[in-house]
């Protein structure tokens, strides 16, 4: 990916859109959560497709809260949740996508990733543990992996980045 196509999060506001009303959003969210529960039951019953939900965000951005709120009406038998933390020794002994592929959803299931395979680029790049060539190769591998899931397993891959300000992050981390 060329630098001209990069998105700079610092250029994207963390403020709610003008005219936004929290009460309206809560009411809409409640209806959508119920609808998601119905759709999840249909997905599970048909066994023809899978969904992989990827949640990324800084510490304190609300990934855990989003999982609890959004998937509240879903049946636990049709969901898996994987929180990707620092790779274990066993995971380090394999390619960087090994642990992610193990957590990919089977048909009929929704797999929720709290953090994901993107961490294996983001964190290592920030700390200077991998060079730009390795970054490029891993991005290509991730794209190929997601295409494989889509093509071979009829998996819908949905990615969310929960974007908060540094002030909000600090506030959330202090509350822990």
Which ranges hold each PLM region?
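Glycine-rich phosphate-binding loop of ATP-dependent small-molecule kinases
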Residues: 1-176
């Amino acid at each position: 990916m060329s630098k001209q196509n990069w998105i700079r999060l610092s250029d994207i506001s963390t403020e709610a859109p003008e005219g936004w009303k929290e009460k309206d959003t809560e009411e809409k969210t409640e209806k959508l959560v119920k609808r998601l529960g119905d759709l999840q039951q249909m997905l599970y019953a048909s066994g023809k497709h899978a969904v992989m939900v990827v949640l990324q965000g800084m510490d304190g951005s609300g990934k855990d809260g989003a999982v609890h709120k959004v998937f509240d009406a879903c049946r636990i038998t049709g969901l898996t949740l994987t929180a990707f933390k620092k790779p274990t020794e066993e995971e380090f002994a394999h390619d960087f996508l090994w642990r992610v592929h193990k957590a990919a959803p089977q048909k009929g299931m929704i797999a929720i990733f709290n953090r994901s395979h993107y961490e294996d680029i983001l964190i290592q790049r920030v700390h200077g543990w991998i060079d730009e060539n390795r970054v490029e190769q891993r991005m290509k591998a991730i794209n190929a992996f997601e295409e494989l899931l889509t093509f071979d397993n009829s998996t819908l891959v949905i990615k969310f980045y929960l974007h908060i300000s540094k002030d909000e992050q600090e506030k959330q981390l202090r509350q822990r």
